[in-house]
Amino acid sequence: MLRIAKEALTFDDVLLVPAHSTVLPNTADLSTQLTKTIRLNIPMLSAAMDTVTEARLAIALAQEGGIGFIHKNMSIERQAEEVRRVKKHESGVVTDPQTVLPTTTLREVKELTERNGFAGYPVVTEENELVGIITGRDVRFVTDLNQPVSVYMTPKERLVTVREGEAREVVLAKMHEKRVEKALVVDDEFHLIGMITVKDFQKAERKPNACKDEQGRLRVGAAVGAGAGNEERVDALVAAGVDVLLIDSSHGHSEGVLQRIRETRAKYPDLQIIGGNVATAAGARALAEAGCSAVKVGIGPGSICTTRIVTGVGVPQITAVADAVEALEGTGIPVIADGGIRFSGDIAKAIAAGASAVMVGSMLAGTEESPGEIELYQGRSYKSYRGMGSLGAMSKGSSDRYFQSDNAADKLVPEGIEGRVAYKGRLKEIIHQQMGGLRSCMGLTGCGTIDELRTKAEFVRISGAGIQESHVHDVTITKESPNYRLGS
């Protein structure tokens, strides 16, 4: 007898039922819990894939209210540096600003500027006492780069200094009065504590919805493998200030993965850890018991994933999410739906099935901010996109995600493909369209918050004819819509 557990459904098998509503789409609250302690302003995460998320995309997504996960197909030092780039991009108060000594040469300062991408450095003594600041304006026309900083720096008498905790309005007024772009935070002994820049104030005003930590820095996540030898990578990422760690595997309900989570939790009791991927209630429970702060669901739904075809294993995504959510009821541990999201309606369906947020790859892979070059093919612009189970990605370092250790291409068994997606422009436009669709869903279903959508919205199951009727039919599309693309 066939051991068939049950029937399982995915996004195209269901629709949400409209309900009486007092909710206007533009008043819907899209904020949600990523973990018990991290709140997002939109329920969107970017996948930890080498053609999707590095610092540039993570910054752009955090500014829109979501969070990006830096992929691990790079050296430990580089991944930690990518995390630092995000954390320092928009800092509020930079608590550990890079400083120079009065004896530092201008040539060394120039090298620092080229490496870091910014030109203002507080000048401190060996005892961390503030004596001045050197900026790009101070040295713009200097030709002798062997001179020490002390010759050209702005001395401390002319600096704008503030005490810790000073009101934003006071700081801005002082900066405006002296016509400067940087204010230095000092204690009573004039020791440097931090630095505030006008640019950070401007960025905060431009992006009020940004996802930030308590210190006003953008939030960022990073992925690590579950295999042995990843301890050093975890330590480096924690030291770099990562907000949430993703212990990433194609099969999270595996003893090796669970053990890695237990060990990481024991070493870092307060670190936010996401574990995955699973597709069953038992898998979700196992991750929660191992110490996960959130559980990621999805075995094989992604556009570039061939796991279900190569292995014959997987659970359609709506059922997988609903089962995981039911298993974690009462624990306060959120579920993340990872993969298979093609339209904003799929985001709404995943959340209505119980997910607190969705992780997307192909949706963001063709954006300006994603890694990789724009390619021209038959007159259209594309960007490359590949699964972390593809031969190319596995030979670069992601093979441990699929429990394979031999990096010779002819010995690897891929569970993903390499392809291309249409170039989509800037990430913020994609987010605007996707979140706009989600807001419209919340208006139609009468759900004012993500939590209400998770718990109140009802589904109907539809037939093949129902999905055919739902899509564009009996017409030729002459102008592409920004939120509806079939194929690529």
From Swiss-Prot:
Residues annotated for NAD(+) binding in this entry: 248-250, 298-300
Documented effect of changing residue 248 to A: Causes a 130-fold decrease in the value of kcat
Cofactor(s) the record lists: K(+)
Effect of residue 50 to A: Causes a 17-fold increase in the value of Km for K(+)
PTM sites of type N6-acetyllysine: 267, 428
Location of the CBS domain: 93-149, 153-214
Name of a matching Pfam family: CBS
Taxonomy, superkingdom: Bacteria
Record's catalysed reaction(s): IMP + NAD(+) + H2O = XMP + NADH + H(+)
GO BP field: GMP biosynthetic process; GTP biosynthetic process; protein homotetramerization; response to UV
Binding site for K(+): 300, 302, 305, 469-471
Effect on the protein upon substituting residue 338 to A: Decreases the value of kcat by 600-fold. Increases the value of Km for IMP by 12-fold
Pathway note: Purine metabolism; XMP biosynthesis via de novo pathway; XMP from IMP: step 1/1
Ranges annotated as spanning the membrane: none
Disulphide bridges: none
Entry-linked InterPro entries: Aldolase_TIM, CBS_dom, CBS_dom_sf, IMP_DH, IMP_DH/GMP_Rdtase_CS, IMP_DH_GMPRt
Database matches in CDD domains: CBS_pair_IMPDH (cd04601), IMPDH (cd00381)
Keyword hit for Metal-binding: yes
Subunit organization: Homotetramer.
Family membership noted in the UniProt record: Belongs to the IMPDH/GMPR family.
Official protein name in the record: Inosine-5'-monophosphate dehydrogenase
Chain's gene name: guaB
